[in-house]
Each structure stands twice: as C-alpha cells, then as structure tokens.
C-alpha cells in the first residue's frame, strides 16, 4: 500500500482539512500501517486495529491538542501516535531509544497524560477539565476507556466525582470491545444478563411472542427492538445516575455515525450541557481476520509475517518463570485442596490457564481490581484457605494499602506470586517491577523471597505456601537458567541463603557477592574473573544475617547485587544488618539506579545499568581498585 493519504497527515490539523468522505480511505490506510508496523517491531495489535476509526474521529472533531484526549491504559494509542507526527518513527516502537508503546508527555504535546496502568483516564481528564476552568480556559477533556478498565473501582470513583459538576466540558468514551487481556468479569458485565433473564422479563417476553405470533413481520421487528434495548437500557440508567448524559451504543467503526455524534457532543459540552458519556462498540482486531478470530493471541505479538500470521513457536529450550509458576500452582493445588488461585485479569500473562481448566472451582479472576484482589485474598485466608495472588510486580503497587492494612496487619497467610519482577523490556518503566523489594520488606510480618533459577522458584513457592504469614516470591519475566525442576514439592529453610561459589585470594583482596534472585548468575560470571565468593541469598526478609556476618568476617569487601531499586532494596537490608552487628566493612550496593529505566531489550537495559557480568566486574574493580593501581576507597560503611 502506498499510504498516499496517510502521508499527508503530520498532525491532526492536517486531518481536519480532509473532506469527511476521505476519512474511510484514511482509515483503511491507517489500519494497514498499524499492521505493517507492529508486524515488524512487535507490540500491541488487536486493540489498535479496533480503535482506528475512533481515533480518526476524535482528532477530526476535537481541537487537539487544545482539547485534551487521555487514552486509558494506552496500548491502543498507535493510531493516535501515527496521526500526531510519529508515523516515520513507528519502526522504533518499544525499542531502545525509540518511541514508547504508551502515551508519554515527554514524547508529544498530543500525549496529554502518561498511561499504561488501567482505569486512570477519567480521573486525569476530570482534573484537566477542572484545571482549565480554574485557569479560565475553554476546552474539552476526553477520556477514552475500555470495558475491561471499567471494572476497576478508580474509574467509578472518578465518574462519581465528575457527576457533581453539571456544566463541566468532560467527555468519557467507553470503547466497548471486550478487550481486557482476560475476558471482563463481574457484576457490571452480568447485570444486563440478569435483568433480561429474570422471571418477569421471561414471562412478559413469552406473552408478547404468543400475541405477535399471528403477525410475523411485527414479531421480527420486536426481536430487533429487543436486541437494541439490551444495549441501551441498563448502561443509560447506570451512567445517567452518575450525572452523565449517556449516548449510545454506536458502531465504533462507522465514521458516518462517529463524526456527527462527536460533533454534537463537543458542541453540547462547550455549551455547558455537562459531562457526556459516549458508548462505542468496536471489534478487537478489526480488519485483520486472524486477529479478529483470536484477539488474545494477537494482543501483544512479537514480529510476524502478516500474510502468514503468528506461527507456532518452537518449544523453547528453557521454561519461563511464568510456566514454572503455572506448573507449581497445579501441582500444589492437587496436593492441597485449600489452595485458591486469584488473578486481577491476568490469566494468560500470569500462567493460570491450565489451573483454571483443572481447578475451575478454585480459580477467581476478579477483574482489573488489584485493591479488591488483595483484600479478597485476605478474606479467603480468614476462612482457613491458602490464597495465591498471581500478579505482576508493578500492579501490586495498586493494592499497597490493602497489602498493609488488610493482609499484613492481620498476619494472614496470603502468597503473592510476583511475576515481571525487575526490568521487563519493551513495555518500559510503567511495567518494570523495580520497587517491590523496597516496598515489601518494610512491612511487618511480610516474608520476601528471590529465587535465582527455576527449581529454586518452585522450592520458594512451596516454602511460601507453608508459612502462616504473608509472603511474596518475586521472579523475572522470560526464560529461566535452564535448570531442571524437581517433581517433589520441597521447602527450603526459612531465612537461609546458600553459597554458590567460594573464592580464593589471587589478588589478596577477597570479594564476596551477595546475590538476590536473577542477579546471582551475572554475579557468578563476574566472580570467575575476580575469583570472588558468591552467596545466593534467597531471602530478603528474613535476611540470612549469620551468612552476611560470616562473609564480612572472611572477605575484604562485600557487593550486593539485585534487579531492583537500590533505594531501600536488598542492599539496604544488608547494610542495616551490618550496622546492627557493628561490622565495619566496605560495601558496594549494585541494583537499578534511582531513575526510571526506559524501554528496550532487557539484556541491553541490564548492561546499561551495569548489571551484566561485565558491568558488575567493572564496578567492583573501579570501586575497590582491584586489578589496577590502588586508589582511595570511599567506603560505604554500615
């Protein structure tokens, strides 16, 4: 495709110069460009193919960037990026030094609010609308939110707050495409089904059908009206109760419907008609049959040939940590009927598909509702069950108060299986699990574990399951070390690390690495060159203080290494232990620096942070003057 029309669009102002009849052609070109781009770089696909017409209509009608558009989650923002001057940079999408896969304020004036976690858009758009009013500026703020994100309480908190302002130019666009990563769940999604399956409705319907059976054309009309009513009745009532003027549902792929509807909405909003709620229905994967047929497979693919589609991948030589967790979960559930599996809408990503199939009565997907997931697990634990909350490290941040107040304060035995701990690569800083060690180890009663390989992950999960306190096991995204897992469900001694290498003293300056989780193996690589000792600490809390003291006594220098924030992390725990013991020894703390790490290849990012074997070795030599002329060492003394 030549993209003749699309190449003329470098900003929404160019788009608004087009005749409305040209928008259909533009949509076809834009959809093809999204498919071509994502197939070459990897990224989110299904959601972006579904928002092409909506994106065009929004930028065609609203005066962006003066009018503010906030994209909830933001993984559906590729058409937006293409239309706002980043078309030629799509080949750098989610790559180191390239454009982000999510809206980013530093990237474009059209990215009015940075997003990546769900359900934040309405709050942000409301703040912008009231901010504009405070400044005496007239503009419209628009939140575009998916049906999956509408399961989160934060979205309803914002709706409840927004409805108070009866003349505020705020627009909420519900992109109803059934596209949370796992199917949306909960009462909101089932409310209409309950209403339409009730006894009164069934009896009324049966009676009407009996009366109208003598007039088939009228009966057919009634059936069509019923289908329309199913989409209209409950949403209108619900959102109007919040103080919004509800419009819809309308076809989110029909530009002839979208454009005039949005024009009317903008006009009414600026005339003081108050908050507007537009319900659009879109199809995930629209226009690419393979993605339409399997939108979950095409939710976030890697590179692929669009003509062939995603081919079955060869079985990897090494299991991922997510697979290790999924297998352990099924094995542990078979061994102990108290086990309950909980996920906040991340069944596939957290490795729970097989568990749901085998133990459906013990599987709970609570929707995109992390706060609820944590407290819900606490309630389960109160009844003597053993809940496992499978959650990404970055998403547990959303349930932090519940973690402290509802679980740890009551010392409830909930296991948090923290996937995506550390750097995650292409998704960047918004999805990095950089802070869990720091924010977990400060909580009383909490136990924190960091496995260094697949078998240790299985063992520490088993150990966590058998504790009578809240526990967290953090493990990284991607493949493990290739270590075979034992079939037996085996515990390890709580609070005890193990030595992986005992170094000599070739240099006369003995170094000991205290490795946590994924950093044990890079530390082993550095230790070979330095002839250093390496401890696999396994536990951040309770820390193996005796091992720390022994290593301090037997070595000249200690080096802690973790794939987490150095501020308040495992290295800080070691320094605290040394201070408590009154031990004075130079300590080098290595981990993720005090800044947000951008997107890119994980190995490259670790290298940039000095957390590969070469970087660790270099840091040790520079800090302690090993292998070079002696230098004064500004020791970090505990």
Curated annotation (Swiss-Prot):
Identification of the protein by name: 1-deoxy-D-xylulose-5-phosphate synthase
The note on the cofactor says:
Binds 1 Mg(2+) ion per subunit. Binds 1 thiamine pyrophosphate per subunit.
Q: Name one GO molecular function term.
A: magnesium ion binding
**Which EC number(s) are documented for this chain?**
2.2.1.7
* Catalytic reaction annotation: D-glyceraldehyde 3-phosphate + pyruvate + H(+) = 1-deoxy-D-xylulose 5-phosphate + CO2
Annotated NCBIfam families: dxs, PRK05444.2-2
Q: Kindly list the positions annotated as binding thiamine diphosphate.
A: 75, 116-118, 148-149, 177, 288, 370
Keywords tagged on the record: Isoprene biosynthesis, Magnesium, Metal-binding, Thiamine biosynthesis, Thiamine pyrophosphate, Transferase
Q: Name one Pfam family in it.
A: Transket_pyr
- Name the pathway it acts in: Metabolic intermediate biosynthesis; 1-deoxy-D-xylulose 5-phosphate biosynthesis; 1-deoxy-D-xylulose 5-phosphate from D-glyceraldehyde 3-phosphate and pyruvate: step 1/1
What family does this belong to? Belongs to the transketolase family. DXPS subfamily.
Which SMART domains does the record cross-reference, listed alphabetically? Transket_pyr
Q: Where does Mg(2+) bind?
A: 147, 177
Q: Which cofactor does it need?
A: Mg(2+); thiamine diphosphate
């Amino acid at each position: 495709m030549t993209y003749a029309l699309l190449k003329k669009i470098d900003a929404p102002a160019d788009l608004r110069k087009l005749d409305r009849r040209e928008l259909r052609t533009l949509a076809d070109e834009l959809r093809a460009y999204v498919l071509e781009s994502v197939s070459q770089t990897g990224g989110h696909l299904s959601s972006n193919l579904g928002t092409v017409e909506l994106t065009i209509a929004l930028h065609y009608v609203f005066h962006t960037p003066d009018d503010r558009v906030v994209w909830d989650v933001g993984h559906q923002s590729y058409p937006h990026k293409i239309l706002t001057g980043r078309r030629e940079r799509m080949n750098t999408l989610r790559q180191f030094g390239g454009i982000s896969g999510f809206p980013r304020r530093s990237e474009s004036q059209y990215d009015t609010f940075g997003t990546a976690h769900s359900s934040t858009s309405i709050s942000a758009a409301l703040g912008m609308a009231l901010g504009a009013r405070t400044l005496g500026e007239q503009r419209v703020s628009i939140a575009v939110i998916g049906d999956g994100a509408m399961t989160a309480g934060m979205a309803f908190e914002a709706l409840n707050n927004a409805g108070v302002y009866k003349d505020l130019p705020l627009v909420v666009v519900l992109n109803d495409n059934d596209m949370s990563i796992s199917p949306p769940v909960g009462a909101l999604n089932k409310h209409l089904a309950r209403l339409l399956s009730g006894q009164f409705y069934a009896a009324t319907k049966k009676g009407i059908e009996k009366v109208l059976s003598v007039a088939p054309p009228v009966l057919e009309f009634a059936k069509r009206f019923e289908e329309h009513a199913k989409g209209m009745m409950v949403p209108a009532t619900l959102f109007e109760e919040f103080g919004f003027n509800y419009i819809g549902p309308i076809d989110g792929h029909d530009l002839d419907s979208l454009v005039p509807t949005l024009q009317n909405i903008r006009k009414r909003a600026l005339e003081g008609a108050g908050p507007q709620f537009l319900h659009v229905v879109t199809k995930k994967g629209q226009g690419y049959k393979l993605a339409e047929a399997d939108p979950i497979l095409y939710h976030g693919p890697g590179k692929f040939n669009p003509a062939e589609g995603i081919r079955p991948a060869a079985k990897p030589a090494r299991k991922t940590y997510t697979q290790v967790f999924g297998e352990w979960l099924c094995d542990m559930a078979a061994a102990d009927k108290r086990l309950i599996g909980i996920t906040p809408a991340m069944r596939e990503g957290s490795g729970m598909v097989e568990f749901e199939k085998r133990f459906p009565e013990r599987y709970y997907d609570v929707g995109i509702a992390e706060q609820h997931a944590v407290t819900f697990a606490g309630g389960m634990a109160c009844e003597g069950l053993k809940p496992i909350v499978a959650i990404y490290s970055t998403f547990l941040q959303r349930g932090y108060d519940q973690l402290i107040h509802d679980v740890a304060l009551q010392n409830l035995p909930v296991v948090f299986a923290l996937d995506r701990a550390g750097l995650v690569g292409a998704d960047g800083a918004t999805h990095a699990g950089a802070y869990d060690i720091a924010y977990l180890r400060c909580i009383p009663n909490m136990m924190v574990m960091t496995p260094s390989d697949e078998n240790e992950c299985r063992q520490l999960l088993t150990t966590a399951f058998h504790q009578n306190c809240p526990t967290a096991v953090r493990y990284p995204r991607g493949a493990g070390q290739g270590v075979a897992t034992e079939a037996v469900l085996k515990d390890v001694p709580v609070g005890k690390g193990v030595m992986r290498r005992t170094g000599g003293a070739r240099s006369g300056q003995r170094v000991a690495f205290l490795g946590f989780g994924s950093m044990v193996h890079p530390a082993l690589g550095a230790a070979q060159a330095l002839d250093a000792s390496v401890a696999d600490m396994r536990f951040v809390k309770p820390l193996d203080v005796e091992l720390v003291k022994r290593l301090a006594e037997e070595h000249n220098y200690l080096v802690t290494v973790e794939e987490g924030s150095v501020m308040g992390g495992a290295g800080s725990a070691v320094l605290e232990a040394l201070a408590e013991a009154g031990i004075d020894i130079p300590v080098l703390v290595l981990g993720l620096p005090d800044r947000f790490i951008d997107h890119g290849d994980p190995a490259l990012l670790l290298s940039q942070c000095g957390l590969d074997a070469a970087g660790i070795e270099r840091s040790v030599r520079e800090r302690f003057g090993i292998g070079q002329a002696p230098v004064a060492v500004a020791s970090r003394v505990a």
